[in-house]
Amino acid sequence: RIYLLHSTLNDYLEQLLCLLYENMMNDAQTGNITGHNTIASALTNIVTGKEDANFSSPNGKYNFFTCSSNTLKCDEYAFNASSILIAGNGEFNVKHYTGKFNAYQRTYVLIPDLEYYALLYLASMYQIKSFKSAASGSIVKFITKGDIENIPVFIPDNKAILNKFNCLLMLQEQYQKESDELASIRDWLLPML
């Protein structure tokens, strides 16, 4: 039950983040808030993971992000930061994670200053959704580094907005870590019944 509660809370937080982001973007378009436009490459370096899919290990200690929506495990980490992960092919999903992890070679890793962490995650998520819907009916094989570098990002002058986004995203990550720990304990205990 606690696991389901955490999952429900995470879904709710994701919806809340999206709603607040859409509201901010609407306010920006109507002139109700001020700020400036930039692109992802102005906020962070963009790199890819170096590992192939065989790098995963079922009992690994660290998360291994691939182009799948499912997160695998591995034995070695290459990154240790609050990061945005964008699948360069396959499902074209966008994830966020704070901690030690590794990434597949077609997964883009963005590590912005913490001030812009949630904002860049939301901008990336909406741009990738837009990219997928614009390509509807045609085959999109991959997303390029240039596509990622040019993700548009609106930065509001009111820093309280950024703080709100970051607090909600960090809360979501905390619930996810607790859910993962509970699932691990459940999986360890079930065979003992």
Regions found by a protein language model. Name each.
Residues R1-S68, D157-L193:
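Non-catalytic DNA-recognition/assembly elements of restriction-modification systems
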Residues G35-P156:
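DNA target-recognition domains and sequence-specific DNA-contacting regions of bacterial/archaeal
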